[in-house]
Amino acid sequence: MKRKYLFFSLLLAGSSLYAQEWPAVRPEARPATRWWWLGSAVDAANLTYNLEEYAKAGLGGVEITPIYGVQGNDKNNLPFLSPQWMNMLQHTEAEGKRIGIEVDMNTGTGWPFGGPHVSMTDAATKAIFQSYQVEGGKEITLDLKVEEEKQRPVATLSRVMAYNADNKQCLNLTSKAKNGQLQWKAPAGHWNIITLYIGKTFQKVKRAAPGGEGYVMNHLDKGAVKRYFANFDKAFKENKTNFPHTFFNDSYEVYGADWTPDFLEQFARRRGYKLEEHFPEFIAQDRNETTARIVSDYRETISDLLIENFSTQWTNWAHGHGSITRNQAHGSPANLIDTYASVDIPECEGFGLSQFHIKGLRQDSLTRKNDSDLSMLKYASSAAHIAGKPYTSSETFTWLTEHFRTSLSQCKPDMDLMFVSGVNHMFFHGTPYSPKEAKWPGWKFYASIDMSPTNNIWQDAPAFFEYITRCQSFLQMGKPDNDFLVYLPVYDMWQEQPGRLLLFSIHDMAKRAPKFIETVHTISNCGYDMDYISDNFVKSTRCVNGKLLTKGGTSYKAIIIPAVKLMPSEVLGHLLKLAQAEATIIFTENYPQDVPGYGKLEARRKGFAQLQKQLPEVASFNETVATPYQKGIIITGNNYQSALEKSGVVPEEMKTRYGLQCIRRSHADGHHYFISSLQEKGVNDWITLAVPAESVMLFNPMTGEKGKAQTRKQEGKTQVRLQLHSGESVILQTFNHILTDVAEWKYVQEQPVSLSLDHGWKLHFAKSTPRIEGTFDIDTPSSWTEIAHPNAPITMATGVYTNIITVPHIPADDWILDLGDVRESARVRINGQDAGTAWAVPYQLKVGKWLKPGDNKIEIEVTNLPANRIADMDRRGEKWRIFNEINVVNLQYKPIPYTDWQPLPSGLNGSVRLIPVTYK
């Protein structure tokens, strides 16, 4: 562990090491990918081949996740954790070390954790309640067997409770139940008898690989979890295999697992009362306040058990073997902040395509809306920031579009969204291992994106990978510098949401926390950034020199309590102590009104009322009021903009006035930003920074260009000149001292007249399947699907557009080649020299250095998507869906062929211009 955490500390010092330059690139800064091992049917030669292809393209890490296999290939499958499988893991680790790729692995196959070693005793568990109404005053005999037949062999009787509502009696009859029958001389009156059986969900591992099939484990049971990891201990020890760099856990998709054998004992110890004495209220369909409070206590207990018995134990186990953990907490029935914070690398997930209305970005009807907006993505990064974790990772581009239709240009906006949300260690979802000899399209995972050498976008993916690497090299440097902490009102959610087991999945968050989501976007639109904080982290936060310092060592200017109804007394009391110690506390819409939960309610309410009396008296939250509170200040009001302004925190004008999105981090000499224009308009103006600066550097992560920015002082604040087209991004680094001997940033001024290159083009194909031979005089730069060749509408290809042009004698500092609408990425050569790769809007490259007087040969190698080819294969009935279990589905998870797909435009698809520019 010392080696890994030493590197973590180096990240924080990175800014002083690499001032004015691009940071040195480490493997963690490069993009990584989930590496699907289909059937674990891998061999040494093809593992080496795949890894070398990944490294050559620019990947820095793989995460092995074994899944279901390929039809007719069972003889080559390697059972998970078998000696043969471990031998291939050893080979992978050795090859990864040789070529500079970090090797992670899933702590299981498919998802969730489980498999053949999970006994029925250790399998995921559920509560089964049954009710019987009886009249007392006589001997009662009841058959208590479980009604659900499949539960009878496995369910165990935990409690038999009797309740008399008239005299409020509660009797524990468990000891009177023998052999599935209750014999009881019932006192007079009407009795409600409730039995609790501990049953099983019978859920099995989804998409399991050979050797990984079996029941999902009970994540809430400490012993079951420990026994699960013991199988890994045994396999690694017996096969003398090194443990991987990181162990991974996918999103929590354990369904219906709402109990564990010792739950009632754990509940009583943690909540201070016996849940079995309140079964009628707990299972009631009508949700009164008592039921809501008891259910809230149940949900908090589930959260505690999941964090302590699963994620914390898993992380401690990994640390014991010199590894770290990476976890997706979303989907779990636990406080997401505390769950994410209990592991080493919190990981968020994108699911679908975001719509930013970026100018010129290709549109595709076969997409689904991204369910992970900024508010969802920030759960993982918030936990990382407040807990002092250096990395936030992401499962990236899951179901961005249908298979075979995802372009690099569509990836960039959602990648930028993740960056501004705090991600700095991305993983593609994903890359299937595919043998070199496999027939195209090779081995595929059922869900997109397919970032692999068998996908045509791999041709120009290295340019995209380099973009990610440059961005992450900065985003891993220094420390987070968000403005506010925002209290996560989890007790309001636990109290208000229907049902009992409450899962915080990506797709349900709009229902789980609509008010909180609105708050997050409001704060962001006011020009600020924030991290969420849980009750546990509030209680460990200190005030140092007027700043809030979290347990992880990250500082914030104030904390926002957003319209919270329920709050534990310890949390409110600590907030008041922070205010007394010079902190700024902002309450919006109302003060907390009550304590959560049911146990010792009246006593806790009395203590809470005493704390409420210490809050400043406020006539109405309609008016924003800042009240001094000993050394600190308490701000109240309904209007976020007004309340946040009174905190004295300076908003970012680039967000409020110009609509840009950004994230800011700090380093020893200042700050650095990642900025993206995720909107229809661009920016070309002086922008006021929220932080002071004596000098500013700009870094273009698309090209590697860098230079000292133009700055000026306006009313004591630093302004920097910024130019961004719609969809573009830039890294901005500030310094507390004046930079000297640094090249200036080149600001572009387009001249009013451009050179149209709309005629004289020829087209041939560097590679194409099915093959297209010869050269075509197409004249205008148009989609090759329109040329007179039977294979043109169906080929997967790299087409080369060639033209000979004469550059006019126009005084210019440089020339920009504007490729217009490119389908989908283009490598440009001018006079035989590589002039760069255009893979995202606005598809422009600076090319002046390669132009010469007289004739100039321009070659544009455009690579399309594989959609046209795969659709043709489906129309011809060619079998390529050769996978077990789920066998490549569409966005709606239906096995629909692509026979109806119309040809997608391919190649250059519009005007090409050469624009003379002046640098200012």
Descriptions of predicted regions:
Residues 1-21:
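Bacterial Sec-dependent N-terminal signal peptides
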Residues 32, 43, 47-48, 61, ...:
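Carbohydrate-binding surfaces of carbohydrate-active enzymes
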Residues 150-155, 159-237, 713-753, 853-855:
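Extended acidic/polar, glycine-enriched regions
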Residues 546-547, 562, 570-573, 603-613, ...:
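C-terminal structured "cap/appendage" subdomains that terminate the fold
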Residues 688, 805-831, 838, 858-862:
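Aromatic-lined ligand-binding clefts that engage carbohydrates, nucleic acids, or primary amines
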